[in-house]
């Protein structure tokens, strides 16, 4: 943790169940602003649910969640919308509208959520497309984009409102190693240049090693390790050591 760096996200005793299935059980952790946290764990251990709790798509059954000093578990309506404006979300799927061009997909949130004139929207779209390496592709339809291009487009969309916190759900899923590494580099560049806090759910241990300042390891809905990659490698928990040592 960087001294003096306030936490961007805090989970305090958070639990979440779906019926009789306990997905998260009394989970507590935080990530300092401007750092990268990678969340590792087997399938079904609550990783993606954690992201949905951060963006308030789900509510915890117990515990508190703070986003940039806002206790989101106490917010509703306009308060939730205000917090969500601080967060970008890179889904596993790029979440693009198939009937719109790439430009139209990226311009849409600015048109709906801001009062920016078209000229300024054009400038922002062009700038972000340049940042993700799609500067010449804005007239393309989503069906014309390769898997790597769709992932870049999804990242561009997540960045359109200049989020302070960027959530990424399996950013390397379905990509070859070279393309996955390129996506990781884009995320790291964003972190370095804009001091964006990254929270990345991944099964890709190599990606976690590239990205993470700290790693959170979940197993059966509980935190079994939380620390640097080196600390996880030397954890007393055998499952945590295995998860950081090989792809799962």
Residue ranges and their predicted role:
Residues 177-179:
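Helix N-cap at the start of a conserved alpha-helix in ABC-type nucleotide-binding domains
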Residues 160-164:
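A short, proline-enriched helix->beta-strand linker immediately N-terminal to the Walker B motif
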Residues 166-169:
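Catalytic Walker B motif of ABC-type/P-loop ATPase nucleotide-binding domains
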